[in-house]
């Protein structure tokens, strides 16, 4: 993939861009195999590759420059702004949206936040696309509600120019830190969730719910989890750290008793909507802390699926799962190092199969799916 910004040295986010893509995959696989070498993996499956460009469904743009000539992209530590509207990681559909948003910022008088001076209102634009429908969710991250009335008043023009904007919101982030979003979210559009679909499973994305940024690879990851679970012929499972329900909804069947747990109420609302649309009667999603939920339950499902943040599931949950002893644990991880550490603490489990999913091309990061079986 050629990137003009990388060539000029103005953006080096894709640290592995000079490395041939097959070599990237080989290096990631070698890294993963090294981490899991102590665990005697029974079967390694081939790496799931990604498209090398235009694969991201989300843009997180720092807004800088002036209200008349805003820049959308990133800030270097020295305060230098780089416009990334032509970043090759984004699909071509993003370009026209960025063009209109720059005009809109000026029309609405949304002064870009100046980090050095601690002045201005508009900090970030967060743009997410639904690959199913070609529609978008747009979030304005503001320092305060000072410009909210101006934003509302100018929205009809924006919606006329960009009818593909399905969800629009304002997030209030008052802290002078490099934090992407605050707690307060104000929905400005009729719709509050962006509709998506992977493998004929409807999914919904609300402004503050997590969603994978590489739809092609995410769909393959969910489908693989579905296929592995189907082979086990089980009838009960937990989906911990479930997000909007991507894994659980793929694995569920009319006979499956599924409980999905996620701390984000926004994400749980999306998961429940999908389950209702699919007509799943034995599926329950709850907004709770996954570790507290699991350690407070007496019943034992046949399979526990975990998809934790980068820190992993942690010692407390590892200890409890080892004691609870479900037949299977399906572990999806965005940080193989924390997963390998957790696997060491999951006593009496062996790794049946492992597959790497290249969710983040041109970087050292990747996703991995591991199926663990309890030793009798």
From Swiss-Prot:
GO terms for biological process: rRNA base methylation. Keywords: 4Fe-4S, Iron, Iron-sulfur, Metal-binding, Methyltransferase, rRNA processing, S-adenosyl-L-methionine, Transferase. It is an enzyme of class 2 (transferase). GO terms for molecular function: 4 iron, 4 sulfur cluster binding; iron ion binding; rRNA (uridine-C5-)-methyltransferase activity. S-adenosyl-L-methionine binds at residues 212, 241, 262, 307. It comes from the Bacteria. PROSITE patterns: SAM_MT_RNA_M5U, TRMA_1, TRMA_2. [4Fe-4S] cluster binds at residues 3, 11, 14, 87. Its EC number is 2.1.1.189. SUPFAM superfamilies: S-adenosyl-L-methionine-dependent methyltransferases. The active site is at residue 334. It catalyses: uridine(747) in 23S rRNA + S-adenosyl-L-methionine = 5-methyluridine(747) in 23S rRNA + S-adenosyl-L-homocysteine + H(+). Catalyzes the formation of 5-methyl-uridine at position 747 (m5U747) in 23S rRNA. NCBIfam families: meth_trns_rumB. Belongs to the class I-like SAM-binding methyltransferase superfamily. RNA M5U methyltransferase family. RlmC subfamily. This is 23S rRNA (uracil(747)-C(5))-methyltransferase RlmC. The lineage of its organism: Bacteria, Pseudomonadati, Pseudomonadota, Gammaproteobacteria, Enterobacterales.
């Amino acid at each position: 993939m050629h990137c003009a910004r990388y060539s000029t040295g103005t953006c080096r986010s894709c640290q592995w861009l000079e490395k041939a893509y097959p070599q990237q995959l080989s290096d990631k696989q070698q890294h993963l195999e090294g981490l899991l070498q102590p665990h005697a993996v029974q079967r390694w499956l081939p790496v799931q590759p990604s498209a090398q460009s235009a694969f991201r469904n989300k843009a997180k743009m720092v807004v800088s420059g002036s209200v008349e000539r805003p820049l959308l992209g990133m800030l270097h530590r020295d305060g230098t702004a780089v416009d990334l509207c032509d970043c090759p990681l984004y699909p071509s559909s993003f370009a026209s949206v960025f063009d209109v948003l720059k005009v809109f910022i000026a029309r609405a008088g949304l002064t870009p936040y100046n980090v050095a001076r601690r002045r201005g209102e508009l900090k970030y634009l967060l743009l997410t696309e639904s690959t199913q429908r070609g529609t978008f969710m747009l979030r304005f991250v503001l320092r305060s509600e000072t410009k909210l009335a101006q934003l509302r008043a100018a929205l009809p023009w924006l919606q006329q120019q960009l009818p593909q904007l399905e969800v629009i919101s304002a997030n209030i982030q008052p802290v002078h830190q490099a934090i992407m979003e605050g707690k307060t979210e104000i929905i400005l559009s009729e719709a509050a969730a962006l509709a998506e679909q992977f493998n004929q499973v409807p999914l919904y994305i609300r402004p503050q719910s997590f969603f994978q940024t590489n739809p092609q690879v995410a769909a393959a990851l969910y489908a693989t989890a579905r296929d592995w679970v189907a082979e086990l012929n089980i009838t009960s499972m937990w989906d911990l750290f479930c997000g909007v329900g991507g894994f659980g909804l793929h694995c569920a069947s009319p006979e499956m008793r599924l409980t999905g747990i996620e701390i984000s109420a926004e994400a749980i609302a999306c998961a429940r909507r999908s389950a209702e649309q699919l007509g799943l009667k034995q599926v329950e999603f709850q907004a709770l802390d996954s570790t507290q939920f699991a350690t407070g339950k007496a019943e034992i499902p046949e399979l526990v699926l975990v998809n934790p943040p980068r820190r992993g599931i942690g010692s407390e949950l590892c200890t409890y799962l080892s004691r609870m002893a479900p037949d299977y644990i399906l572990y999806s991880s965005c940080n193989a190092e924390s997963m390998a550490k957790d696997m060491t603490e999951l006593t009496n489990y062996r790794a049946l199969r492992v597959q790497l999913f290249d969710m983040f091309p041109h970087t050292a990061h990747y996703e991995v799916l591991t199926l663990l079986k309890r030793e009798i």
